[in-house]
């Protein structure tokens, strides 16, 4: 998947055996759950809990990859990496990109499925 791809529909469809109904259910569950997950990231950033922040970013990275959200996956990876390095300031700068990529992915999913 090329860098910068917001939504890899072909990839997610292949992983779900080209079942569009299942793809809609999986992506809707992701869209419903991720805003809460991002709020948890925000809480960990505010408290400076880098260990939990790293785990939470890793979780979002994996969920994003499973629904074809390549740009969001990359943004979550950047936050995970910053947290692992102990760089709270860098992790905080990652939050707005992560939120922006989630919004872009949401629009792409809603217009594609």
Predicted regions and their residues:
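Two-component system phosphorelay core
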Residues: 1-113
């Amino acid at each position: 998947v090329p860098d910068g791809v917001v939504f890899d529909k072909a990839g997610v469809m292949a992983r779900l055996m080209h079942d569009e109904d299942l793809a809609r259910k999986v992506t809707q569950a992701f869209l419903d759950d991720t805003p809460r997950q991002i709020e948890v990231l925000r809480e960990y950033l505010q408290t400076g809990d880098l260990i939990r922040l790293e785990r939470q970013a890793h979780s979002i990275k994996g969920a994003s990859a499973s629904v074809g959200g390549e740009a969001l996956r990359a943004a979550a990876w950047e936050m995970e990496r910053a947290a692992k390095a102990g760089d709270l300031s860098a992790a905080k700068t990652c939050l707005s990109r992560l939120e922006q990529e989630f919004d872009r992915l949401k629009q792409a999913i809603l217009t594609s499925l």
